[in-house]
Amino acid sequence: MSIEVDWGAATSGPDGEALAERIRSFIHDKFQQVALPRFIRSVQVHSFDFGTIPPELEIKDLCEPFADFYEEDEDDEASDVSEGLVSRHGSPWHGTHPELNESSFRDDNAINHSLRDPFTEGFQPSALRSPIALSDHLNPHFRSGTPGIPGGTSTLGYHLMSLGGLSGTQTPLAAVAGGSPFAGGWNDSGMMGPGNRGRPPPPIFTAHQSRPEADIDSSNPTSRPSTSSTLPSHPSGSNKNNGDGAGGPDHGSHPEEHGHLDDPTSEEPLRFPRMRERRPEDFQVLCHAKYAGDVRLSLTAEILLDYPMPSFVGLPLKLNVTGITFDGVAVVAYIRKRVHFCFLSSEDADALIGSDQPDVGAQTEYSRSGGDATVSAKRQGGLLQEIRVESEIGRKEDGKQVLKNVGKVERFVLAQVRRIFEEELVYPSFWTFLV
């Protein structure tokens, strides 16, 4: 189903101007964080304009919002009571089952001294563990993990990897789209004892934040983050106070690692973010978006000339983005008084709505405009396919420019525009608007 957008009403007026200024300021701030090459001194973003050509939207599906959209922000001004905060698995255990935290469920720990009491003051849950929180309350001896294998051999641990830093083929969106309770990890808040109830959660990376480039192997786009540095959970047979050596083959083999884990002052422990409660009126729209408009972005970059000496003089290069060609899948989720917006990568879009057949005519036109002929122009989630730009360098004298079209600077600036767009607007990153 296709829909029409009143582009003029949506992008004009005081609200439209304020949104354009926020986008300009956001892109400008991102450029200040970029490591510039030696021949560029600075990059400034001066203006942003939405243009007059609206995008073409076709609704593909209506579904439940992604689990990441329910994460509670640290700076959120909304009341915790009104938002109905619940644990990561979506069940308000703290409010409806207070008896699960009573001491009657902790008395059995005296039977086996090698088991670490999960309700002691110094215990902090691991980022990866077997997802049996309710059984931990009812029977602490149930989790008898395999010695030497942190967290046991349960394959459910695969679903507990945080999705906040993965995208494309690394994101199991089939589970996320269905609102799977394992989509964003498991909350161990239900195991917190009375001494830990009033302790506020420390900051944690959420889906709003992008991954540092240093954590990603750019040479291998399908590589996953290494799990060698992940903090393991304590096996049920290991305890720092157990001196019989029966805690598994890794007991005592890494004393510095165990000392690091048992020292609460060594590093701030990770905790899962709080989640808002799902409501029946929450919904999400997946739509195929096409755009070949006249959005404008004005930038200036100062180029350094090294003759006759290094950084001898700087020349201002003005770049005007006069339009873009876009083809992707947009996600719009409405949750209470918030609208969450993002785009999907090509792999995630194919997994959710399927891939369309390539358009030969569009692919030919894209190749003529300078795009890669081996890449289909109708890549679902391909996002920015073309950026049209005009450049001027130096001051104009008698209507003539000093130089024209400095290719290196153009390629660098446009590559950064693409990177900022895809890192900040492609799931798991998203923008939230209050309505």
Curated annotation (Swiss-Prot):
Stretches that traverse the bilayer: none
Region: Disordered, residue numbers: 73-113, 186-268
Superkingdom of source: Eukaryota
Residue span, SMP-LTD domain: 1-435
Family: Belongs to the MDM12 family.
Main function: Component of the ERMES/MDM complex, which serves as a molecular tether to connect the endoplasmic reticulum (ER) and mitochondria. Components of this complex are involved in the control of mitochondrial shape and protein biogenesis, and function in nonvesicular lipid trafficking between the ER and mitochondria. Mdm12 is required for the interaction of the ER-resident membrane protein mmm1 and the outer mitochondrial membrane-resident beta-barrel protein mdm10.
Ranges of compositional bias, category Basic and acidic residues: 96-113, 251-268
Biased composition (Low complexity): 218-238
A Gene Ontology BP annotation from the UniProt entry: phospholipid transport
Keyword Mitochondrion: yes
Localisation: Mitochondrion outer membrane; Endoplasmic reticulum membrane
GO cellular component terms, semicolon-separated: endoplasmic reticulum membrane; ERMES complex
Main location, first listed in the record: mitochondrion
Gene Ontology MF annotations: lipid binding
HAMAP family: Mdm12
Entry-linked PANTHER family: MITOCHONDRIAL DISTRIBUTION AND MORPHOLOGY PROTEIN 12
Protein name: Mitochondrial distribution and morphology protein 12
InterPro entries in the record: Mdm12 (IPR027532), MMM1_dom (IPR019411), SMP_LBD (IPR031468)
Secreted recorded as keyword: no
UniProtKB keywords: Endoplasmic reticulum, Lipid transport, Lipid-binding, Membrane, Mitochondrion, Mitochondrion outer membrane, Transport
